[in-house]
Amino acid sequence: MIGMGKFKISDALNLRAGKNFRIDDVDPTATPGFDGSKSDLADRFAHYDEELYELQERLFANGRAHEESAPSVLVVLQGMDTSGKGGAIRYVFSVFDPQGTKTVGFGKPTEEELEHDFLWRIRKHDPVPGQVVAFDRSHYEDVLIQRVHLSLIHI
């Protein structure tokens, strides 16, 4: 089960939406799989804090020692406004050493960003070796918004 050990590929595959999934049917206030308060949740996952801190510290040190071959981590949160992306990032990243992390929010593209391909503004924030980076939103939204917006302009 997720949150009860190592996260496996099978866990990720279980998170996929089925063929008949409709976003209209989702209750945005629901917390499926968890019945409890915020403090219950914090208590349930508190034992991971030290492990996460140590793993991030080793990752960062490895990045400093073996810059080119060291791994990095990119966390991408995509969701509607007020869906809790920023809160999730703040909560998870609160256990990390800030010098090995970076959080990037993507809003409306600037004029300079619009002059380049849609991944240009994303690539400049890719994690360097040993770094953990969180993206608050992603390039998927850029592609969707720009295409839908441009198609509406041309109607």
Model-derived segments and their meaning:
Residues 153-155:
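Conserved small/polar residues in nucleotide/adenosyl-binding loops
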Residues 130-132:
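Loop/turn-to-beta-strand initiation segments
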Residues 63-71:
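Phosphate-binding P-loop
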Residues 77-92:
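Glycine-rich phosphate-binding P-loop
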Residues 2-51:
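Charged, amphipathic alpha-helical linker segments immediately N-terminal to NTP-binding catalytic cores
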Residues 99-109:
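Short beta-strand-centered segment that lines the nucleotide-binding/catalytic pocket of NTP-utilizing
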Residues 94-98, 112, 124-128:
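Conserved catalytic network of the ASCE P-loop NTPase/AAA+ motor domain
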Residues 85, 112-115, 141-147:
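Switch/connector loops and helix/strand junctions flanking conserved nucleotide-binding motifs
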